[in-house]
Amino acid sequence: MSSKIRPSADDKKLQRVLYFFLERVRAAKDVSGQLLSPLIDNASVDTASVSPSSNGRPTTLKSIQSKIDEFQYHDFSEFVSDLAYLFINVKALYEGTQTYSFVQALEEFCIQQLRTFQQQGYIPVITWPNTDSPSATTSSPISRNPEYSVSPPNGSKFVKNEDEAYDSDLYVEEEDSDVKGRSMVGRDGRYKSEDLKRRKLQPSSKPLSSLEARAKVIMRQVRRYRDGSGRQLFAPFERLPDPRMFPEYYQAIEQPMALEVIQKKLSKHRYETIEQFVDDFNLMFDNAKSFNDPSSQVYRDADFLKNYLADVLRLEAGKLDSEFFNYETDSRASPQLPKNDIQPAVSIDGTLLNVGDWVLIRNPADSSKPIVSQIYRIWKSDDDINYVTVCWYLRPEQTVHRADAVFYENEVFKTSLYRDHPVSEIVGRCFVMYITRYIRGRPKGIRSTPVFVCESRYNDDTKQFSKIKSWKACMPQEVSGSEYEMILFDRPITLTKVASPLLHLLASKSQGLPSPATTDSNTHMLPSQGSLLPPSSISETKSFSTKASTPLSTDDIATPLSSAPNPPSVMPTYARKTSSHSERSSHSSYHNSSHVPTAAFNSPIMRTSTKSTSPIPARPFYAQSGSLQSLNTTQHSHQISGGHSGRMNVPYAKLSYTSHNGRHGGSNGNISGAKTPMTNYTINSMPSLPVFPPAFIVPGTHQKLDESSPVPGIDDVTVINTETAKMLDKDEHQNVLWYTVPPLDPIPLENRNGSLTHSVEYVLYKKSKGSQVITEKARSNELSREAKFENLVASLSDALIPP
């Protein structure tokens, strides 16, 4: 890959897998502990002369390492091909020598690692080329069959954690393979930079039919299933094997099928019923079972996923088509209205509305807040009524956000909610600008048309906000490249943010329950009022995300600063003996089980959002061979359920620890950890709140653990030693005083305004110490002078005495 081309996300993931594989090859050793990789890494001759067809291929592991560093591999099969040809040349070089057996052993190790990577889901199904065959040295480079090439060569996904990777089935629809071949690959087989930019994942701006929405829900649930160890079972079924490297598969299977083929057929609307979609899934699993040995892991996974698919279908069969847009799909158009006559424009109040125009749709829930929308399609129904398919843009008060969130004035958020409205529901025009243009000017000729600013998307499923990176990707295809004239400001304006418009919904103790309200079937599923969530703490991220399945309490709702409780005063509390733990725990339980303020949760928005964000129906749990798990209903007393907030106050209590030999039921692949298949998820099935041992016991607040015989020095009022209690402050009733904070007024220093001096004792000590030092120094000097004088006398006497 050219250094000027920025590697894609798939190329980076592939590079990590290749590095991991290459490290295992370099670490391979023989029985004596000697590394085997130098045999193929330090070839002493040009191995390209041995195999003429290997011109341009790496001749050492170092050259393969260089190709990995430069992102020249777009598919794992290319790496396998180069590594296989490297072994062909090295074996030809050492043929007839003792080294040949070591090279062959290293090749077998690579084949074994290839199978391990496939079983772990890192790579698709790839076979090692037959390097012993003479035709192996003359075969062409590996490439996919155009009939099944639904993705470019670098489109392979190496799914170790499918949740981290994106779900391509919920985004851009796939193009024809021949179109991709022309647009994505040049003559040299490398990708152009502009094509790589176009491959960047962007949400689809096309509304989905009810069949597509239902199919994608089923596809996602089956695809994301994981066993107890976290392994993704669906990884081998993502793509078809390479026909050049695995021709026997296509000889044995008459109708090859994989997820890539199903996705292509679904995006091209080849399925007329959901049964046809399910038949292809069953065909894919049946092919895997017929081709693989019954004892293989792929066979067991295919059999399990087929049964799991049947249970998912039973769970989804009872749902209406209108339910699927709420939590699994990004868009929806009304399927019950046939769109027979597609029109380029429609006239309303003497003006023409075209695709891409911004309009305000009547909002039956709040007529003062019409729905900001953009037209994606104009059509006429069978009863000769003009309709428009629009994409909704929600206002801040129509979203679920934290109480400390701030927004721009006139800000709206793009959603993936698509609706069909009669033209008669359009109440006027509007205009939405991206923030980079909004601060620079206004569109020309809009007059009094309201203008809104947009910077982020809003996910109605996860209640998350995310910044928009490409405004053109948010536009309909008909107007994605068009521009409009602007009247620029003298200088860019500075936008200010305002507080949440829902702060007035914060409940008070005197506020009663609001009366329920009904809305129109085609109105805002999130109408005039949004919902407030707890403000983010310092340790939390800046995201507005929240899980609707997390229960909220009155302690979690944000409180304005003016009404926040005052800090505790420095008042003593008495260390009195409490009656029993049950009274304290019941009081705490009553406090923690307070109901959520009804103004935030009983509004129409919360009734709808609670339904739409409820957890997906529980996936059935299966006990697979080799990974059986005991479904024990016993819960450890110290286990915390993931649905409870970590900020809850847990009352003190005595603990009786009991050993449990059973394991908890559930699987990582099972959403709710159901005890039996088809068990629905319910809040009541959650374990009770845990009780922890206290880090320390405040004296006087607990009973003695042993009531049989009092311990000497311990009275019935406190649990501290009486000798220690005598040293503590007490009131007139001889009750020990316990302060909540340290004292504010320490003992003042004497002579605060005077100069600080040493004490008399210290001064006398320094004087005596100094005089002692002086005396010792004088004595040392006197001895030194005497020694010098004696030396001088001795030298003079020696000089005067004749020899």
Swiss-Prot record:
Domain BAH: 351-469
Location (main, coarse): nucleus
Keyword Nucleus appears in the UniProt entry: yes
Pfam families (UniProt xref): BAH, Bromodomain
Cell compartments where the protein resides: Nucleus
Sequence ranges assigned to domain Bromo in this UniProt record: 9-117, 206-316
Keywords per UniProt: Bromodomain, Chromatin regulator, Nucleus, Phosphoprotein, Repeat, Transcription, Transcription regulation
An annotated GO cellular component: chromatin
Keyword Transcription regulation found: yes
Chain residue ranges for the region called Disordered: 128-160, 174-206, 512-616
Phosphoserine PTM sites in chain numbering: S168, S331, S334
Biased composition regions of type Polar residues, renumbered to the chain: 128-154, 512-525, 540-553, 605-615
Protein name: Chromatin structure-remodeling complex subunit rsc1
Gene: rsc1
